[in-house]
A protein has these predicted regions:
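Pyridoxal 5′-phosphate
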Residues: 1-329
Length: 329
């Protein structure tokens, strides 16, 4: 286990003792948020986050609000990134946590993590948590100035039910699972060696082949954008500088669920909102960017990977054309 942990730490550029094994990003996010805030009661109870976060972050924040914490959401700009000036305005002496996703799961927007970390240097009692679930293998990971970072291996072809929390060595957080500290005092329970080995292998493949994989996916994304832009009712929600693996779009006047169902009849799988959202509600991320509820309800997401082929894109475009003619005209 020590050798595997050393390998993971080396790949991420952190210390082995900064690696905490979890059951997934949901547990990692809960451990980080609750652990930081509960260990910082003597400083304050003010938290800053965004409307773009995964439901495990939103759920943890709701639980902390019930414990007396105050949560402010930083504004989102039209390009999907957070408003850094508004972040500066929200920061207070009693702010103990800023929780931001590195890459938004619905739009693919890359957040300015380094700039956020630089701003927080003037607030030594405030910790920065980054949910990097959608970032690994898709963009450069920023760890400088980050106190905790959640990683979900199943997003880069690791196993479901496995996760990591990278925690800065000197940071003290409150454990959420108590018992014997076999590998860390912050999360009781003995991690499975096979799970750890699968994380190391998947992480190594994702990072060592990252540039080649990104270039392939970016070419497919450009092809999709060029062809889909020919349809007058198509509106792209993902910004141009989003990770190429995620392309969010709307077809004006057609609910995203209707397109999802019609494409599904042709064995094409697309997503409406994030996987853990409440069914029937508009996409929080798309609404935050477009300020348009109808557009948010019409939005859906195409996911690409290094395994996606040009032939699959060509077949998808043929199927999309038939669905568009049936639903949008």
């Amino acid at each position: 286990m020590a050798r595997v942990t050393d390998g993971i730490a080396e790949l991420l550029g952190v210390l082995p003792e900064e690696i905490i094994y979890t059951s997934g990003a949901s547990e990692s996010n809960n451990l980080a948020l609750k652990g930081i805030v509960q260990a910082s009661r003597h400083v304050g109870k003010h938290i800053i986050s965004t409307a773009l976060e995964h439901s495990s972050v939103g759920g943890a924040l709701s639980a902390l609000q019930q414990q007396g914490c105050e949560v402010d959401l930083v504004d989102i700009r039209r390009d999907g990134t957070i408003d850094l000036e508004h972040l500066r305005e929200l920061l207070r002496k009693d702010t103990v946590l800023v929780a931001i996703c590195a890459v938004d799961s619905e739009l693919g927007t890359v957040q300015p993590i380094q700039e956020i970390a630089d701003i927080l240097r003037d607030y030594p009692n405030c910790r920065l948590h980054v949910d990097a679930t959608q970032a690994v293998g898709k963009t450069k990971l920023v760890l400088s100035g980050v106190d905790t970072m959640s990683i979900a291996p199943h997003k880069f072809y690791g196993l479901n039910g496995s996760g990591l929390l990278v925690k800065k060595k000197d940071l003290v957080i409150e454990p959420q699972i108590h018992g014997g500290g076999s590998t860390t005092p912050y999360r009781s329970g003995t991690p499975a060696l096979g799970m750890a080995m699968s994380i190391e292998k998947a992480l190594r493949l994702a990072l060592e082949n990252q540039n080649e994989r990104i270039a392939h996916v970016a070419a497919l994304n450009r092809l999709l954008r060029a062809e889909l832009a020919k349809y007058p009712k198509v509106r792209f929600n993902s910004p141009e500088n989003a990770v190429p693996h995620i392309l969010n779009l709307s077809v004006n006047g057609v609910k995203g669920t209707a397109f999802q169902q019609e494409l599904g009849k042709n064995d094409v799988c697309v997503s409406v909102e994030s996987a853990c959202s409440v069914e029937g509600t508009p996409s929080k991320a798309v609404y935050a960017v477009s300020r348009d509820r109808k557009n948010a309800l019409s939005s859906w997401r195409i996911s690409l990977s290094h395994l996606t082929t040009e032939a699959e894109i060509a077949e998808f475009l043929q199927i999309f054309d038939r669905c568009y003619r049936e639903l949008a005209q």
